[in-house]
Amino acid sequence: MADRLMTVNAYTTLDLVDGEAKGHGFTEEAFATLNVTSPRKNPDHVSLQLELDPTELDTLAPHADSVRLSPEQARKLAADLEKHAKNVEQA
C-alpha cells in the first residue's frame, strides 16, 4: 500500500484483507489492513484500526478508521467473531 497511514510490521494483526467502504451513493472495495493494539504504557483500552488501500479508492481520501474498546467490549467482539467464524466453517 502506497501512502499508508498505519504502521504495518510483523506484529500487524491482518496486513492484507478484503475491505469495503460504503457511503451515500458509492461503494468502494480495496485491500485493507486490520490491526488490534493496546497502549504499551498504562493500557486502558484496545484499539481496532482499519485502513483501505488508498491507491484502490476513487471517492475516499486516504484515511484510517479506529475505535477504542474497553476490555469488556473487546471480549464481546472476540466472542462474536468466534461465533460467526464457526458458523461460516460449518456452512
Region locations from a protein language model:
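Positively charged, low-complexity terminal tracts
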Residues: M1-A91
